[in-house]
Amino acid sequence: MLKRERRILLLMREYVLGGAETQFRYFIEYAEAQKWKLDVLIEHDLNIDDAALKKAAQKMKNVRFYELDGGRDSGRLYGSIMLHVLQNMLHIKYRTCLIYYPPDLTVAPLMRILGTHVVYSERTNGAAIGESRYFQKRLKSCNYILANSRYAKDELEKLTGRRVRQIRNGKPVVPQFPVKKNRGIRRILVPARISADKNQMLLLHYLKKYPKFDGRIVFAGLEEDKTYRNKMKQFINRNKLCDQVEFLGHVENMEGEYEKADLIVLPSLGEGMPNVVLEAYAYGRPVIVSDVSGEQDLVTNPRLRFGVKNPEEIDACIKYIQELDDDSYSRLIEENRKVVLQDYSIEKMAKSFYAILSQ
């Protein structure tokens, strides 16, 4: 009988999309360095022609990439996933399949039938699972459930009655930018995929309500929701905000944008463990966030949080930061960076995943 190679299978919507994909790229890069045997199925939910994926596929030897052609709405995607597994059964034994996007739980029962363990990793606040009996039923087929935030862990444990393990996100060690001599806030960076759940419209309402703000708001992220993007554009045009708003799209290296920014804002309706906050902390930039689960664990000062429908509270957060004396501001920046360096290493994140995936 042929001896089959034992490998791990990771399902990804796209190689580059949002925070979840960023974390799994970190995992993939670490896996390659450690010579872990990993196959990555890129589903191409959004049909993105990704140069970063092509570069990674050419460079890596231990991690292998396979590209599908979408078709989630028609169900064709799930057939393509299972076809890949079946076509490789003679020479590959997928011991574990890692899923992070709830609709991909569709394949969990079939994977179990084929003898593959299934691990689900919750990347937001667990709301999608909580609102869908279908996802809850499929989740029962998973051998392990993971979450990247304490809130999501607690919510999924209450929902499923099962143990949920928390694996914190990882962040590369990066140089800290010096504190700007002029601490005025004129360039606000909003790093997130363009989508209704990221709530970028709130920043546009802030611009409309506070015309005295004479700076610029910069949105950096892939356009996931075209309808929402069009809604934003219409609002911008209607309120003559074009000179104060910039859309960068996907930025492969965000370091320069963080360096230019005076303030980072994350207005999401819900989060797990937000990469944006970790990045802002690591680079030494102030950050304010929506007052929702997930973000409260990282941004513990309530004066740096705002309601998801309240541009007035954004203004209050900005004033709070601007009114800090130099010592208090520097202490805030240093304490934030210390949190990332102590608790959010990529090595710890990747090894924690592998300990479960390799069982």
Please place each PLM-identified region on the residue numbering.
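N-terminal strand-loop element at the rim of the active site
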Residues: 10-18, 22-74, 157, 225-228
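A conserved mid-protein helix/loop that constitutes part of the nucleotide-sugar donor-binding site
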Residues: 21-29, 190, 195-209, 227-230, ...
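Acidic anion/phosphate-binding donor-loop and adjacent secondary structure
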Residues: 154-158, 168-186, 196
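Aromatic "clamp/platform" in nucleotide-sugar-dependent glycosyltransferases that forms part
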Residues: 250, 269
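Short hydrophobic beta-strand element within catalytic cores of glycosyltransferases
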Residues: 286-289
